[in-house]
Amino acid sequence: ESSAASDVYKRQHTYSHKNLTKISEDERTSQVEDTADIIESITGTRSKLVRPPYGAKNDDVRATVKYPLILWSIDTLDWKTRDTDSTVAEALKAVDGDIVLMHDVREDTAAAAEQIIPALVEQGYKLVTVSEMFEAKGIALENGKAYRKAR
């Protein structure tokens, strides 16, 4: 199994995409831990990172979510524009250490990725997982802390 493929199961986005700042501590914990349990039961690997829905976080989220919170430094707005060219243009603004937000359930985003990946590789970038990027930069991820980029 490749490192990138295995890392997919080390991150999660909660069970039902609820805004973690607007639910109780018990529900917040359930959203994250139940999802981690499901991922682990299917893959044998427990998730190690969380991307909070909407990027929503506050002190309560930071205190109760026992994982690093992975946000983004570039939002392609693919969910809003639904335009492949726009998504490509935004993603290609990335510089070393950026985290680019894209939604893998959209066909136009998948089409954009088919253009973005070779373009970034041609520019000399190595595409890695979030965990690999932070490790390469010597940045230790801490539970409850939010990260937008690795630099």
Please report, for each region that a protein language model flagged, where it lies by residue:
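Single conserved hydrophobic/aromatic residue that forms the stacking wall/gate
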Residues: 1-5, 9
